[in-house]
């Protein structure tokens, strides 16, 4: 066992002495040491109860013959961090979480790992760190929250609350109506109830085989979720000494491919592209945006969940058959699903999905009745995004899939919010928000506030938005993000001027600005990218080391 390095031999008497101080005895030194990376934090609805899941996991590990050691990571709630300087810390927190997992696991030479994440950057951060450690690992998330409901029974979620702000600003709803939405949108603990970033990443963990079936869709704070935690903890002990289940043996090119298949079939958050680029690099099987676009062209979009379809939430998809049913339906197009990929249960993906059935063909549609013959995410290229940009096609109205608009430029999210609220954005505009990329922000803020304002103010079918920042998984509409190169590194998005004509053509996978190469070259002659001092030593370091979105916004280490 790896942990023998800290517990075997006379030389390790001091180490054992310290371990005895934590309650270990002679018999424990013969057992596998299992790390539990928890992300309990009181302020996040999907995490405030994870301390109890950690306790359950420890109990099960002991019963199964292991010795548990629980430790914690930090966490950021993107919804609470939204719309102010706190959002600059969200994406950087992914790197801190990955580093902390690597640090604790390798410093103490633990044999296996149970990861208990749930929201936003915590899932990919844990997965990146666990891949570096490369011990047998099982993921079990905290689970999605229930959908909220208004007094008339209408299902709502957090995105409803964000869009309600725009409606209130326009006088379309009253303070009382806004208050009802505020009080009902998030009715329980759990990750926000739609196919937002947290649930998207938890679904992808299931698709990659690093989590048990149900990980992405079983509701939080239910007996079924608790049982999932128990099974995951026991499984970590069972595989602790089995080389087949070292994490990089599971998260290989086939598993990453399957994750992107499910992502496209379910129209996941655009943030999944950013995270899977980063995860694939840690796995030693790097994806590119071209790879992702190739997969998108072969996978039908068969499930729509909020925000793409406001009435459908994760609990509905679970009742309809969950991720196994989605994979099984996608696999009907031969060769799309890599069915030989091994999962943490010891089954292959093919074996896992063989008995899956779709209980509601309107929620998980057959291929013959797909929403689209291609995936719910798309990668765009063009002179405005030479290295690529990402759009959630699942959330775009058909009338906006091809759109040309007049650029109105903002050099920060704050400027854009003020401009939208102040009535500067009109039908026919193509909003440009720049200097919000990984380096320029720094931190690549999510643009849920401006996109929700656009939708809430009734501009969703007449205004598009493009940014080198990113979006919440709750964003919908003609919103293109992750533009690379970003403005801060000299990207063309920094050269766009008010009045330029910008075109998005989803079918052609194109994002262009109608400005000649000669004119762009002329503008570049006097162009100096803006530099923003974040007033934080951590964010300064982050800005210095981070790559652009086309590379997953990972930190460079080669120049250190």
UniProtKB/Swiss-Prot annotation:
Positions of [2Fe-2S] cluster binding: 119, 192
User: Binding positions for Mg(2+)?
Assistant: 78, 120-121, 446
This protein's GO CC annotations = cytosol
| Origin: domain of life | Bacteria
GO BP terms: namely: isoleucine biosynthetic process; L-valine biosynthetic process
Could you state a single Gene Ontology molecular function term?
Answer: 2 iron, 2 sulfur cluster binding
Cite the annotated pathway. Answer: Amino-acid biosynthesis; L-isoleucine biosynthesis; L-isoleucine from 2-oxobutanoate: step 3/4; Amino-acid biosynthesis; L-valine biosynthesis; L-valine from pyruvate: step 3/4
- For the protein in the UniProt heading, the enzyme class is lyase
Cofactor binding note = Binds 1 [2Fe-2S] cluster per subunit. This cluster acts as a Lewis acid cofactor.
Recorded E.C. number(s)? Answer: 4.2.1.9
Tell me which residues bear N6-carboxylysine.
121
Q: Enumerate the Pfam families for this protein.
A: ILV_EDD_C, ILVD_EDD_N
Q: Which keywords does this chain's UniProt record carry?
A: 2Fe-2S, Amino-acid biosynthesis, Branched-chain amino acid biosynthesis, Iron, Iron-sulfur, Lyase, Magnesium, Metal-binding
The record's listing under InterPro entries reads: Dihydro-acid_dehy_C (IPR042096), DihydroxyA_deHydtase (IPR004404), DiOHA_6PGluconate_deHydtase_CS (IPR020558), ILV_EDD_C (IPR056740), ILV_EDD_N (IPR000581), IlvD/EDD_N (IPR037237)
Catalytic machinery residues? 472
What reaction gets catalysed by this protein?
Answer: (2R)-2,3-dihydroxy-3-methylbutanoate = 3-methyl-2-oxobutanoate + H2O; (2R,3R)-2,3-dihydroxy-3-methylpentanoate = (S)-3-methyl-2-oxopentanoate + H2O
Q: Which cofactor does it need?
A: [2Fe-2S] cluster; Mg(2+)
**Entry function:** Functions in the biosynthesis of branched-chain amino acids. Catalyzes the dehydration of (2R,3R)-2,3-dihydroxy-3-methylpentanoate (2,3-dihydroxy-3-methylvalerate) into 2-oxo-3-methylpentanoate (2-oxo-3-methylvalerate) and of (2R)-2,3-dihydroxy-3-methylbutanoate (2,3-dihydroxyisovalerate) into 2-oxo-3-methylbutanoate (2-oxoisovalerate), the penultimate precursor to L-isoleucine and L-valine, respectively.
Summary of subunit composition and partner proteins: Homodimer.
Q: Which family does it belong to?
A: Belongs to the IlvD/Edd family.
Q: Which PANTHER family match?
A: D-XYLONATE DEHYDRATASE, D-XYLONATE DEHYDRATASE YAGF-RELATED
Query: What's the name of the protein?
Result: Dihydroxy-acid dehydratase
Give the gene symbol. ilvD
